[in-house]
Amino acid sequence: MNIKKIVLGIAGFFITGCAAQLPPPDPSFAATRPVATPPPQPNNGAIYHAGYEISLFTDYRARQIGDVITVVLEERTDAEKGSDTAIDRDTSYSLTNPTLLGSGVQFNTPNWLPLASNQDNSLEMAVKAKGAFSGGGDSSQNNRLNGHITVTVAEVLPNGNLVIRGEKVVTINHGNEYIKISGIVNRRDIKPDNTVSSLKLADARLAYVGDGATHEANRMGWLSRFFFSRFMPF
């Protein structure tokens, strides 16, 4: 009976550990709440109460802190880069034997380098060096991000532009997908349905990352990362 309880306890521990947990929000992309302004006290007996009206002509597009706005993600980038490098170096240096009083200078000092290798122990010598290096690389990258994310207005700039930010976290199969975005929106770029294209964002910061088993499966091991790092001499 005790063994059965221990086994059930261990199984429950592992099942609890495998349960997906929602990660805490990133403070840099946290939603901004509007400033709470208490409505005026209602006047009992009156038909109209200030602060509770609904205007038929109000523009419901985002315009103040805390308002929500939907960003239509339409990101697509294509980049290509190539480089070729070639270096050749050829150096030669020669020294003729000096003459003294019409005859060449000779030294009778065998086994001294480089004099021992020269003919007649003279000072005449020649040095040649040659080196070559060539290298090349090509890189191409294609990215596409489509979707929608609703964020909040964090700040209204003096010129009327809106600073927006927000994030979306989706947990699927013990893995989390993060979509984070921030930027500056011109009010004139906001459509009547309160949406704006991500192509219209200034100073845009977009991130689409994930974690969990699927994310870890796409990562190289530490030994593979070493062979592809800059510390690998070959």
Swiss-Prot record:
GO CC field: bacterial-type flagellum basal body, distal rod, L ring; cell outer membrane
Signal peptide limits: 1-17
Keywords associated with the record: Bacterial flagellum, Cell outer membrane, Lipoprotein, Membrane, Palmitate, Signal
GO-annotated molecular function: cytoskeletal motor activity
UniProt-annotated location(s): Cell outer membrane; Bacterial flagellum basal body
Main location: membrane
Domain of life where this protein originates: Bacteria
Lipidation (S-diacylglycerol cysteine): 18
Membrane topology: Lipid-anchor
Record-linked PROSITE patterns: PROKAR_LIPOPROTEIN
Transmembrane domains' residue ranges: none
GO terms (BP aspect): bacterial-type flagellum-dependent cell motility
Lipid-binding residues (covalent, N-palmitoyl cysteine): 18
UniProt cross-references to InterPro entries, sorted A to Z: Flag_Lring
Quaternary structure note: The basal body constitutes a major portion of the flagellar organelle and consists of four rings (L,P,S, and M) mounted on a central rod.
PANTHER family: FLAGELLAR L-RING PROTEIN
Family in the record: Belongs to the FlgH family.
Function: Assembles around the rod to form the L-ring and probably protects the motor/basal body from shearing forces during rotation.
Protein name (database record): Flagellar L-ring protein
UniProt source species: Nitrosococcus oceani (strain ATCC 19707 / BCRC 17464 / JCM 30415 / NCIMB 11848 / C-107)
